[in-house]
């Protein structure tokens, strides 16, 4: 998959000279993503992996097909490598907890002095 995302793909930048540097907290979405989300909410909004009715099945299919699309986009070996979380903090916590049995006494966890607090505490906890 070849992709070239440009600033012009993001509607938020259309009307003002915005410089946005807080993507770790909330990332801006390109128009294609906004349009796809809007369409999903309008036509397939239901619980994913829980509903046995048609609308729920469609919602689950869209959810899982997005995993495939993302897997292709990031060149993952498998869509099973793509995990959805509520945000970066949850992702970091999930990663650090998943490494708990792999980390051994004497191993080093390296962080820069510029890390956000949410990327320090999970590693401090793991180091204990």
Which residues does each PLM region occupy?
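Pyridoxal 5′-phosphate
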Residues: 1-128
